[in-house]
Amino acid sequence: VQSMVLTACKRGDEIILPRNVHRSVLNALVLCGAVPVYVNPEVDKRLGISLGMKREQVAKAIKEHPNAVAVLVNNPTYYGICSDLRAIVKMAHDAGMLCLADEAHGTHFYFGGGLPVSAMAAGADMASVSMHKSGGSLTQSSLLLTGPNVHAGYVRQIINLTQTTSGSYLLMSSLDISRRNLAPVSYTHLRAHETLANL
């Protein structure tokens, strides 16, 4: 997440994001000096949980802060709530902004049909996917996915600033094994989970 934010933002840049972001996003803002423009998601009064950002809230933030360089979305939130990601990506791009996604709890979106759209399928520019949370890889391992609007060489440069240059082959191999395990069986497993959830 830090590398994603540091790739998109420089000192003084504004970034639009929900108030319920992970602290790693806030740490990235401290490191790069970017200025947060918070969108306050509504709270479901019955469940007492924060919801996702509404299209109208994002549109208002973009209109009020046209010089922002990026919009960051939780996809999904910690509680599994998804925003209208396709619409938010389009709004960001129409305004000349990048769209970044924290997919800490959205690993499964890449491996099964009938699920909410993954950030990259929605056209986001970057997504941080925490395979270790719901994909089965070792703790601390995650994927940083990039789209065509982001220069991969620059991303590598930022990663080298924030992380060790001696990557853990144990962590990297656990990512690959988890991806391999999820791909062929994902549809069957996700349908079984969906069936259980609907009981």
Q: Where in the sequence are the language-model features?
A:
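General beta-strand structural signal in soluble alpha/beta enzymes
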Residues: 17-18, 38-39, 72-73, 99-103, ...
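Amphipathic alpha-helix from the class-I
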Residues: 173-186
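Short, structured coil segments at secondary-structure junctions
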Residues: 32-33, 95, 122-123
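Conserved PLP-anchoring active-site segment centered on the Schiff-base-forming lysine
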Residues: 8-25
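Active-site phosphate-binding strand-loop segment of PLP-dependent enzymes
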Residues: 47-108
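Active-site PLP attachment segment
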Residues: 118-157, 163-174
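Conserved small/polar residues in nucleotide/adenosyl-binding loops
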Residues: 188-195
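Short loop-beta-helix segment that forms the pyridoxal 5′-phosphate
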Residues: 1-3
